[in-house]
Amino acid sequence: KNYEQLSFKLKRLLRIPSNLYIWQHLEKKEIYGDGLTTSHLIDKWFEQICRKSITMGLQQRTITETKIRIVDVLEKTGRLYVPKQILNVEEAGLDYLISSEIVVIQNDRVGFVHQSILDYFMSQRMMEKYFHVQKLENIIGEKCRQTPGRRYQVQMFLQNLLEYNSEDFIIFGKEMLISDNIRYYFKYVFYEILGQIQEPDDNIIQFIIDNCENEIYGNYLLNNVIFTRKQYITILRNQGVLERWYSMEEKKSIVFNLLTSIAPNLDVEDISFIERHAFSDKSDDEQFMRCFLHDITQESDEMF
């Protein structure tokens, strides 16, 4: 019954086994809000664990310090589990986290029950470092530490940064793109998150307009963020970028490719753009024809 009341987005999130595990530990009255990402779920769960520690006669500070110590040691060693002996934490705090099923102990080795939980706490570290104005490489890590596992932590950090403030997200992303000390598949995370934004705000819109022709990463933005995504192509059209590119022989093909990539999902303004430029050049008309589907049932009245 509770599951059926959840939003579609949350149901989709819970298809991931580790997310479902976390959700099952949450108080049901807490889960119908905005917990729409893995980060939200983990944050709510740990808040709940800390809150309930008081009823067990423990101080929240003890629980938080135990968690911090575990994360510290795992980060320094680069491991998912570490010997209990080297943690040097209060036994009561560790036992409580184990009984809460967020931490596990096997053969005297301690770690979090799922790697996504460690990833989230590591992404929190990155957020703290960012607001303490640390260097880019100190936040993400040196190249030798830019592993696939670290990539997911950076992804969580960037998603949380975007949620906090899109301007900070853009500033940090631009630093990543121009840095020689960041691997490309880490830079690509920035493109991925941009591509997932359905309703770009003013900061995102301005970034796209200012950088779609950037000499360093303009083509990457076109291919990985703008292409096939109507929300971004609409921005370029509304700001006159498509019109300008159409007037430039060397860029005209980009306009054709962008419009074709969102067909048949063309709106009235897209069709008006095509109408303004159609029937003036046979070669251009052949390119515009790519926006028309062979299946007429999918075409709009405006396109006809």
Residue ranges of predicted features:
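Extended amphipathic alpha-helical scaffold segments
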Residues: 79, 106, 124-304
